[in-house]
């Protein structure tokens, strides 16, 4: 059993350019129990990559020449050599934004994510842009789980392809990971998400997090595509979630921000902007009885 005697969270943002910038932020969550064994894991996060296969190409843009899958893949390869206990997640909207997506409808993005060894992703609203059948095609190609707990997909072709959550048994720990998607109304054309039933993310999160806790998860991670404002509400009205990795609002945070959950406990929320320019890093230190 693992107790969160303390969780030390560090966010390193690596900018996609030669001579990467490193910004370090540290905070502690108060002790809950006496530890006998310490375990450290690193969580890496991307979100709202929007098909940015190549670096930014618009001259005059402050991010010109940054981002791109090659830079990210190179960084990940080197990072894993130096840090063996790493989990890699994406918070949705891998789709839409360049001709690669228009031509290949997401296949390039998913295959590259397979090569980079992603551990899980959740669904962004732009994943629906070519409809449910295309989503099913892509998720079958994925060598990583796709999780979304607040979309009822039983009446769609995604029924057996998307899970509410997964439990990853890594590094001697059980890591519970669940996803949350944005409300389709106003974001997704009705004919592109027919049969998808949106459910309240707060109610669903409390249910799933409690279930993951009962299943003995040492860490519970939420992959959210709700946007920063909804993530703030999510924290304030839930319990048992240890980390929220967010997307959708294209918010770049220079470090994780702590919010109090319904029990008054700190929960770090992390957003890493858009276009794959940044990779977020969160270091967790857990103490096991």
Question: What are the roles of these predicted feature ranges?
Answer:
Residues 1-19:
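N-terminal secretory signal peptides that target proteins for export/translocation
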Residues 35-289:
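Acidic, metal/ion-coordinating pockets
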Residues 14, 25-27:
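Aromatic (phenylalanine/tyrosine) cluster motif
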Residues 27-35:
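Hydrophobic h-region of N-terminal signal peptides that target proteins for export
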């Amino acid at each position: 059993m693992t107790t969160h005697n303390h969780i030390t969270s560090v966010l390193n943002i690596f900018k996609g350019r030669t001579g990467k910038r490193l910004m370090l932020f540290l905070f502690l969550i108060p002790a809950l129990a006496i530890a006998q064994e310490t375990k450290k894991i690193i969580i890496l996060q991307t979100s709202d990559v929007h098909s940015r296969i190549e670096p930014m190409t618009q001259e005059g843009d402050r991010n010109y020449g940054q981002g791109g899958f090659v830079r990210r893949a190179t960084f990940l390869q080197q990072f894993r050599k130096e840090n063996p206990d790493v989990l890699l997640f994406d918070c949705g909207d891998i789709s839409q934004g360049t001709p690669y997506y228009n031509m290949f409808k997401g296949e390039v993005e998913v295959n590259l994510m397979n090569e980079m060894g992603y551990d899980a992703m959740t669904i962004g609203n732009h994943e629906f842009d070519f409809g449910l059948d295309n989503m099913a095609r892509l998720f079958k190609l994925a060598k990583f789980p796709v999780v979304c707990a607040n979309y009822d997909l039983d009446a769609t072709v995604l029924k057996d392809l998307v899970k509410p959550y997964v439990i990853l048994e890594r590094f001697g720990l059980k890591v519970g990971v669940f996803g949350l998607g944005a409300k389709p109304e106003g974001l997704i054309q009705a004919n592109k998400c027919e049969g998808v039933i949106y459910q309240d993310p707060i109610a669903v999160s409390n249910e799933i997090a409690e279930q993951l806790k009962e299943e003995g998860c040492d860490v519970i991670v939420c992959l959210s595509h709700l946007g920063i404002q909804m993530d703030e509400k999510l924290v304030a009205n839930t319990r048992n979630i240890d980390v929220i990795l967010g997307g959708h609002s294209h918010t770049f945070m220079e470090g994780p921000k702590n919010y109090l959950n319904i029990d008054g406990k700190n929960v770090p929320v992390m957003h890493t902007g858009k276009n794959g320019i940044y990779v977020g890093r969160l270091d967790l230190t857990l103490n096991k009885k």
